[in-house]
């Protein structure tokens, strides 16, 4: 009879995944929750309490991947009805609602400041936090029988909720990291035309390397813990020694290495070249078979970790794609040609009030990016010369799937905020807390997942016990995040 460790490993192995359309429908529950939350907070004179906040922004997502995984449309309806009723009641009781929801005053003409450039946008907070919530729930839920196997990571070829989640986490990191770049570029006291200097280049790489040491240390700690505690592992996911924290830790280092290129070439072009080049290398050489073969696993350190090493190329491409969205998603006003590049203060002053073809608002930019990325993804899907979607490889199809999905999701959040939300009324403490301590919340989720697996036979839990554990887990993460946020404790790894 096999050990419990072997049973758990088998439970997450050789899976085939589900459909792309179902993945969209399930994750769109977060959009329904965001819409309902905004309708309630915008149209009712009601300050949303922590329990209601938790139910709308966490419980609904948990329900979508457990109890309502086979009836997602019903869940959408159950979530939206309270919001729609709130809007009806609010409009009925407030005759001057249109006056109160009049258009925002236009910004005064003149030169904008750095503070006006990087304003807080609730829809980005909701997007990043909901992504983190569903990721944290999934990494624990996958070890229970209640979690549908079609949502778990596939072995090699195919799509699933968790496969999408990994790439989306990296995309979100890229988007968030672009904030510092935009700020630096627009800083009037520092902003000058880029000139390559070896000393600055080396300094940037060293700075990024030092900054990422804590995340790489977490990767090492996870490796040692898994090996010494006999924790279940899925070798074909990243390899014998590699793990997701190592991938996350290496991203800023390689970003620093290609920094000179990014100062001259639009980020989305660089990302496309990387993932297309990687795809060509796989299909035109023996690299694809080298990665997928099982008989060469123990030949060297490289073959032991071949999935982690080569999939890093795809994740790096996703990271840069995420950064490319920052120039029009994070900014509070339009800057010259922000669809393709991050603007310096001199470029902004020189352009003045001119608005070119590639100067867009957040909504316009997201609409263009969504149409382009979706069209490119579906073309690649049908192309005979491109390999099928594989998170294990992080190939071209996978990269474009992740980018097109996140662009579509961001557009959805943006439209909800633009049409429905009153930013001052739709402030979720839970979403703000997760957004402010994102990587730490992800780390806590991993630690609690490990602790749960070490103390409980997850495969032996029935549905009620499983759901109770997952609710408690989500509640603990939310309380910790909100408490840290309340006292201004932010840990940036």
From Swiss-Prot:
The EC number(s) this enzyme carries: 2.3.-.-
One annotated Gene Ontology cellular component of this protein: endoplasmic reticulum membrane
Pathway: Glycolipid biosynthesis; glycosylphosphatidylinositol-anchor biosynthesis
Keywords associated with the record: Acyltransferase, Endoplasmic reticulum, Glycoprotein, GPI-anchor biosynthesis, Membrane, Transferase, Transmembrane, Transmembrane helix
Membrane topology: Multi-pass membrane protein
Biological role: Probable acetyltransferase, which acetylates the inositol ring of phosphatidylinositol during biosynthesis of GPI-anchor.
The family this protein is said to belong to: Belongs to the PIGW family.
The protein's enzyme class: transferase
Protein name: GPI-anchored wall transfer protein 1
InterPro entries given in the database record: PIGW/GWT1
Species of origin: Debaryomyces hansenii (strain ATCC 36239 / CBS 767 / BCRC 21394 / JCM 1990 / NBRC 0083 / IGC 2968) (Yeast)
Major subcellular location class: endoplasmic reticulum
UniProt-listed Pfam families: GWT1
Transmembrane segments: 15-35, 48-68, 70-90, 122-142, 156-176, 201-221, 244-264, 268-288, 309-329, 366-386, 396-416, 439-459, 464-484
Subcellular location: Endoplasmic reticulum membrane
A single MF term (Gene Ontology): glucosaminyl-phosphatidylinositol O-acyltransferase activity
Glycosylation sites: 395
Gene Ontology biological-process annotations: GPI anchor biosynthetic process; protein localization to plasma membrane
């Amino acid at each position: 009879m096999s050990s419990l460790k072997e049973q758990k490993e088998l439970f997450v192995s050789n899976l085939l995944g589900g459909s792309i359309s179902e993945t969209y429908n399930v994750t769109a529950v977060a959009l329904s929750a965001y819409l309902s939350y905004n309708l309630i907070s915008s149209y009712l004179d009601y300050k949303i309490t922590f329990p209601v906040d938790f139910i709308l922004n966490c419980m609904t997502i948990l329900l979508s991947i457990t109890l309502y995984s086979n009836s997602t449309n019903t869940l959408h309806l159950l979530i939206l009805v309270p919001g729609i009723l709130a809007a009806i009641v609010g409009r009925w009781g407030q005759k001057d609602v249109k006056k109160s929801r009049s258009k925002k005053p236009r910004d005064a003409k003149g030169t904008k400041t750095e503070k006006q450039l990087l304003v807080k946008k609730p829809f980005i907070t909701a997007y990043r936090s909901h992504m983190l919530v569903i990721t944290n729930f999934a990494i624990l839920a996958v070890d229970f029988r209640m979690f549908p196997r079609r949502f778990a990571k596939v072995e090699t070829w195919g799509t699933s909720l968790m496969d999408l989640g990994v790439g989306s986490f990296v995309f979100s990191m890229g988007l968030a990291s672009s904030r510092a770049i935009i700020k630096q570029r627009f800083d009037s006291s520092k902003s000058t035309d880029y000139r390559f200097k070896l000393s600055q280049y080396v300094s940037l790489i060293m700075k990024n390397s030092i900054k990422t040491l804590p995340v790489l240390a977490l990767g090492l700690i996870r490796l040692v813990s898994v090996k010494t505690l006999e924790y279940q592992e899925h070798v074909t996911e990243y390899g014998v020694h590699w793990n997701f924290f190592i991938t996350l830790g290496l991203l800023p280092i390689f970003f620093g290495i290609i920094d000179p290129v990014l100062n001259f070439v639009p980020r989305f072009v660089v990302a496309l070249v990387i993932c297309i080049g990687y795809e060509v290398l796989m299909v035109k050489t023996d690299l694809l078979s080298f990665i997928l073969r099982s008989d060469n696993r123990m030949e060297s350190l490289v073959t032991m970790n071949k999935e982690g090493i080569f999939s890093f190329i795809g994740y790096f491409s996703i990271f840069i794609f995420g950064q490319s969205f920052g120039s029009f998603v994070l900014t509070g006003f339009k800057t010259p040609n922000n669809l393709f590049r991050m603007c310096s203060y001199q470029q902004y002053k020189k352009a003045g009030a001119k608005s070119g073809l590639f100067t867009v608002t957040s909504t316009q930019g997201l609409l263009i990016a969504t149409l382009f990325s979706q069209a490119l993804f579906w073309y690649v899907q049908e192309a005979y010369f491109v390999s099928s979607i594989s998170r294990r490889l992080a190939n071209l199809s996978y990269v474009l799937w992740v980018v097109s999905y996140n662009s579509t999701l961001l557009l959805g959040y943006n439209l909800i905020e633009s049409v429905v939300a009153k930013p001052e009324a739709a402030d979720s403490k839970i979403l703000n807390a997760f957004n402010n301590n994102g990587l730490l919340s992800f780390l806590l989720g991993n630690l609690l997942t490990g602790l749960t697996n070490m103390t409980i036979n997850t495969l032996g839990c029935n549905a009620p016990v499983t759901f109770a554990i997952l609710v408690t887990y989500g509640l603990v993460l939310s309380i910790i995040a909100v408490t840290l946020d309340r006292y201004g404790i932010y840990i940036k790894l």
